[in-house]
Amino acid sequence: MIKYFTIYNWLFLLIILVTSSCQSKKTPKYILAPFSNLDTLSTNDWWNRKTSPIIDMKVPRDQVIAFGIYTTSNNTLKLSAQLFPLYPEESRKVKLAFYQNNIWKVVQTEQVNEIGWSVLFRIENFDMSKDIRYKIMHGETAYFEGLIRKDPINKAQITLAALSCNSNKDRGDRDEYVKNINTLNPDLIFFAGDQSYDHKEHTAAWLKFGLQFRELFRGRPCITIPDDHDIGQGNLWGEGGKKSLRKDGNDGGYFFHPEYVKMVERAQTAHLPDPYHKEALNQGI
C-alpha cells in the first residue's frame, strides 16, 4: 500500500511540475509600466491590445526601428533611436554603426528602454568637420540609415525650418511639407512643441510623428521640445516639476504620473545637447 501511495505521489508531483512549466512558457515576461491607463498601446502586454487608430504597433520585424534623431554640439553626438514595441523574446540591444573606410563599423551598443522604447547613443570627441553616414541596427534585419551633417561653420548664415502643433485630426502623411522643406534644404529642423495631441498615448503618437517627418531629420540635426499636449494637458507651466491637481495644468506643474512625463522627455529631448541645469526637479522630472 505504501509502495502504491509513493508512486501516485510521484506521478502527482510530476504532473504539477509539467503543468507549471507549460504555464510559465505561456506567460511572457515584460517590464511592468510604473503607471496605469497611460501609454497602454506600448506597455506591458501591448500585443494583446486592439488595433489603434493612431498607428499599427505590430510591424514587420525588419521595420522595428522607426527613426533616428540627433544633434551635435561641442564635439558630442547625441542620437536617439525610436523603436516600435518589442516582443518579450526579442533582443533589447540596439547598435549604432558609422560608415568608415568603405565598411560599416559598430561604434556603440545600447539597451532600449522598455518604457517608451527609445535608446540614446552618446559619442564624445566626435569629429564635426565632415559628413558621416550612420546606421541604427536591431537584430538581424532591422535598420535605419541616415547622415550626420558636418557643422556648417563655414557658412555666413545658417537656415532653420520651424514647425509646431502636429494635429491628430489628420493622421495622414506630411509628404508635401517634407518635400517643400527638403527643397529649401535647411541646416537645422526645429519642432517647437505639440508633436503629439494624443494625451495618454505618447509613444504611439511619437512613432506616428516620426514616420510623418523622419525624412526631414534623417540627414540633418533636429531639435524637438515637448509642450503641453505632449505631456497630456491643456497648458504647461512647469513650476519646478510640481504636481498639478488639474487636468488642464492651470495650477502649474504636471498632472500625469512623473514617470510618464519623464518618458515623454526622454523620447523628445534625450538627443539634445546637454542642458545647463542638469539636476532633476521635483518628482524627479
Language model feature labels by segment:
Residues 11-16:
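Hydrophobic helical h-region of N-terminal Sec-dependent signal peptides
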Residues 18-21:
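C-terminal motif of bacterial Sec signal peptides marking the signal peptidase cleavage site
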Residues 27-285:
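Metal-dependent phosphoester/phosphodiester hydrolase catalytic core
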